[in-house]
Amino acid sequence: TRTEAGLDFVSLVEKSPVLLVFLRHAGCTFCRESLSDIARNRAEIERTGTRIVLVHMGDRKEMRQLIERYGLSSVDRICDLDRRLYAAFGLKNGKLWQLFGPKAWWRVLVAGFLRGHGVWFPTESMRQMPGVFFIQQGELAKSFRHRSIADRPSYMQLVQTGPNN
């Protein structure tokens, strides 16, 4: 698997720690919120020597524009249209309650309307669940698997050394 810039993913994880962030579709409120959170924490994450890699399943141009809007244009990206990498990391399609449960509705109001991330129509598979993985020395060190699309991981907590959460 290669990044959109042509870098080999295996080489990346062997060279430095990687925070691998699997996004949902570009229309997802929580995808936008995740990009905002990553942008806000980026300098601190990178100070740990960690490289951020975003994985998406959407149109390259549309995702590039969205990622640029959050000031993350220089972050490595992997376009995984067939969602093989999602599957390799155990990220599945969400169940109805994970996608449309009370937590998701409440957080859409907060993140989408109050915090300005918007509410948009799905552009790709709306059932795909997101996830975040911290890879260190080529090994999976920590992971955050969303139980709901509305879950909000602490990216800094993931890149700090210590046992898996």
Located regions from the model:
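Short, acidic, Ser/Thr-enriched surface-loop or helix-capping motifs
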Residues: T1-T3, I135-Q136
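Structural microenvironment flanking redox-active thiols in thiol-disulfide oxidoreductases
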Residues: S34-A88
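A structure-centric signal for secondary-structure junctions around beta-strands
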Residues: G6, K15-S16, G49, S74, ...
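Short beta-strand/turn micro-motifs composed of small residues
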Residues: L23, H56, Q136
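Short active-site neighborhood of thiol/selenol oxidoreductases, capturing the structured segment around
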Residues: F9-A39, R51
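Thiol/selenol-based redox catalytic cores and closely related redox-interacting motifs
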Residues: I67, S73-D76, D80-A150
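A short, polar/charged loop-to-alpha-helix boundary motif
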Residues: A150-N164
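A short, well-ordered alpha-helical element
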Residues: T3-F9
